A protein has these predicted regions:
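A generic "binding-loop/recognition-motif" signal
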Residues: 45, 56, 75, 91-92, ...
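Short acidic-glycine-tyrosine-enriched beta hairpin
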Residues: 10-11, 74-92
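Ligand-binding loop in jelly-roll beta-barrel domains
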Residues: 81, 89-109
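Glycine- and acidic-residue-biased ligand/ion/polar-headgroup-sensing regions
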Residues: 56-58, 62-68, 73-74
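Conserved hydrophobic/aromatic beta-strand scaffold that supports enzyme active sites
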Residues: 38-42, 60, 76, 84-86
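Conserved short histidine dyad/triad with adjacent acidic residue
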Residues: 22-24, 39-54
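A short, N-terminal "cap"/entry segment at the start of jelly-roll beta-barrel domains
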Residues: 1-37
Length: 109
């Protein structure tokens, strides 16, 4: 069982120093428990997450910098800095950086 402990995960640091590079994006995990997971993500220009579904959890993004385009349950949308994106469980979604600038986000489930 993984429960939360009090503390601070510093900027540019992941839990236990972990950082992942997946499909050209950088993911830095910020918290992880049995009930919640959050991570900071950087999407360089031209990178994307292909459409997929999460069967067991809702997913959220808070856009920190830049712009991301989304396929949300078949509809095309976009979000910019300050926007919160809601990705309900069981609904298909894809994430695309079609801009010329990196986008930075905070994800959580």
């Amino acid at each position: 069982m993984r429960t939360e402990i009090a503390g601070i995960t510093r900027a540019n640091e992941g839990i236990q120093g972990i950082t992942w590079s997946i499909l050209g994006q950088t993911y830095v995990p910020k918290s992880l428990t049995d009930n919640s997971f959050s991570w900071h993500a950087t999407f360089p220009p031209g990178t994307f997450v292909p459409p997929h579904i999460h069967p067991d959890q809702d997913e959220y993004l808070y856009i920190l910098e830049g712009r991301l385009d989304f396929m949300l349950d078949g509809a095309d949308e976009f979000a910019t800095a300050g926007d919160t994106v809601r990705l309900p469980m069981g609904k298909p979604h894809g994430i695309f950086n079609k801009s010329q600038q990196a986008a930075k986000t905070l994800f959580w489930v």
